[in-house]
């Protein structure tokens, strides 16, 4: 993915003139201090806030300000606001996990009357939900349980499952471990790394936790003042990242 001159109008975030190249198949981290723009980048690209500039993926221009067109281009997003954006709290795990893929890709639907009518494939929906309940160790009473009734960590796992079910080629994940316990954090990070390795999916992980980024990312970009201050290998010393975070970007 190539990002050029990206700006985003998101309250509490500064994003102006972001230029960034993401390598196919890598896990790229984006870090930085609060309000400096790291959260605005994925929210702007995925159409949740007004944005401008140029974003290309696999040689195709990605239309900004259109969440549906981003999904059609095989992009997916796990938002930092899991209760406000990520989940249908009063719906079942099955509906949360399967609905986006049904709506965008017509997955988990059975055709009738030569395709004139499509109806939910309940067996397939249950199967995909159970697959992710098992793989992500989602603690629940079953696939029919409502998302509202789960703990924060398990809600986050459902958000991941929803994105995984889309089988994207490129995945943005914003603050994936925020507000969840230590054990659940590691499972979420392991799931992201496994998804990347087994499916060749490019992952961009945005996080306030530098050490979490360093644990699974190949490279880490630091955002300061709404721009990319620098990109370093994840193995570089923490002090180098700290210097970028407080740097004045010209």
What is the meaning of each model-derived region?
Residues 1-250:
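Glycine-rich phosphate-binding loops of nucleotide-dependent enzymes
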């Amino acid at each position: 993915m190539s990002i050029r001159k990206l700006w985003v109008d998101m309250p509490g975030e500064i994003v102006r003139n972001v230029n960034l190249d993401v390598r196919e198949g890598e896990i790229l981290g984006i870090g930085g201090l609060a309000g400096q723009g790291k959260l605005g980048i994925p929210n702007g690209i995925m159409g949740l806030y007004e944005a401008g500039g140029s974003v290309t993926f696999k040689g195709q221009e990605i239309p900004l300000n259109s969440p549906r067109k981003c999904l059609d281009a095989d992009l997916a997003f796990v938002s930092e606001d899991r209760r406000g954006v990520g989940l249908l709290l009063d719906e079942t795990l099955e509906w949360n996990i399967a609905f986006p893929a049904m709506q965008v890709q017509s997955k988990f639907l059975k055709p009738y009357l030569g395709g004139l009518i499509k109806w939910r494939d309940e067996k397939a929906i249950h199967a995909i939900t159970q697959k992710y309940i098992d793989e992500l160790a989602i603690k629940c009473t079953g696939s029919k349980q409502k998302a509202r009734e789960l703990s924060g960590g398990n809600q986050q796992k459902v958000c991941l499952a929803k994105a995984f079910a889309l089988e994207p080629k490129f995945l943005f994940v914003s603050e994936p471990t925020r507000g969840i316990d230590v054990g659940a954090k590691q499972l979420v990070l392991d799931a992201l790394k496994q998804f990347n390795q087994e499916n060749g999916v490019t992952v961009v992980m945005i996080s306030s936790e530098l050490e979490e980024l360093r644990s699974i990312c190949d490279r880490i970009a630091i955002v300061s003042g709404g721009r990319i201050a620098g990109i370093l290998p994840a193995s570089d010393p923490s002090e180098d990242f700290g210097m970028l975070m407080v740097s004045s970007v010209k």
